[in-house]
Amino acid sequence: MNEGVNVGNRYQKIDLETWKRKEYCQIYRSAVQPQYCVSFELDVTNFKKYVKENNWPFTMAFIFAVTKCTNEIEEFRYRFLDGEVVLYESIDTSFTYLDKETELFKVVNVPMQDTIGKFVQLAIITAENQTEHFTGPVENDVYQFSALPWITFTHVSHTDFGNREKAQPIFDWG
């Protein structure tokens, strides 16, 4: 496999001829909407207690926890890059953050950290100091997050711009 770096994250190019997922990739990549949505309820009682004990914002801590878990699953780290399938060593985060003064959200990109405390601290600083609502296109080497804590829902859909190179998971909760 060939190696490379995209926006700070290392990846390996996948040899499609020997890849066990080749047929699936070819079939679903040509679909109009190749994504699917999985919704479920998750009991976060103990996690909320842990977050509160450490005085962390729940959203930032939950983004870390989900990213840590998904980075451990190889299938979540596959992406398309320049027409090829690549496997990233790790994936960073991109999340919406509500600016309370303007009541508009901004998209904030934060690199994954090795501890929840470091991540939460960096996420807070980055979100609060970022003045732009959009800093540019969301890269492939991120998981996208959107929290809607003031509502309860069991399904959500997203704007689909039709870019087949974008294959990153999107996590939402409320």
Regions picked out by a protein language model, each given a short descriptive name:
Residues F47-I73:
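Acyl activation and transfer enzymes in specialized metabolism, enriched
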Residues M1-V5:
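N-terminal amphipathic/basic-hydrophobic helices that include classical n-h-c signal peptides
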Residues N6-S39, T59, F145-S146, F153-G174:
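Flexible, Gly/Pro-enriched loop and linker segments at secondary-structure and domain junctions
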Residues C37, S90-S94, N140-V142, I170:
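Broad gene-expression machinery/nucleic-acid interaction feature
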Residues F76-V108, Q144:
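Small-residue-rich loop/turn and linker elements
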Residues D99-H158:
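Helical lid/core segments from catalytic subdomains that handle acyl or acyl-like groups
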Residues Y11-Q12, A31, I91, I124, ...:
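Conserved GHKL (Bergerat-fold) ATPase module
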Residues S39-E41, T45:
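Residues forming anionic-ligand binding surfaces in small-molecule and nucleic-acid pockets
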